[in-house]
Amino acid sequence: MTNESHRPSGIKDYAALALSTFGVGYIPGAPGTYGSIIGLAIYLFLGMHLAEAAEHGRSIGTQSAFISAFHFAVIAIVLAIFVFAGIWASGRSTEIFGTDDPHEAVVDEVMGQIITFLFIPFTMSWKLLLTGFILFRLFDIWKPYPINTLQQLPKGLGICADDILAAVYAGVCLSIIYAVTLM
């Protein structure tokens, strides 16, 4: 469905465009893949900085359980911000671009990658990073049931909900692969 698009006007429209596209939504080719790369980069950035903080915590005698809980809490808070702001920005982008699911809006792929990697401990293993990346992209593109039905939800919720569930599917598969590699 195509609606009438309009030029962005005001700070809210520009904020929605910046958040929903991360700038990469305008690159021709595969904006969803580019958005996924941004999500993976954010995961790595957070993970590396949290790993440094964890090392410092261990050096001053902080318990490992507290460090793990803190690590997870920070990523969960960042993810929650992405989800709520992403749903708002994606919804706003439908009005700006005049379509129900503008390909320029990639915040859903960003949050999808972050969710995918919540299912395993932080890793720098390129094999696991590539596997998680590919699994999310496959589920996001394939959209098996009930992922495909979530796109029917209104505006930003419909744009983001299918990617959130695709990330859960990918995360479960990734955690199984991770567990098997530990055996």
Describe the residue ranges of each PLM region.
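Hydrophobic core of alpha-helical transmembrane segments in multi-pass integral membrane proteins
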Residues: 75-86, 175
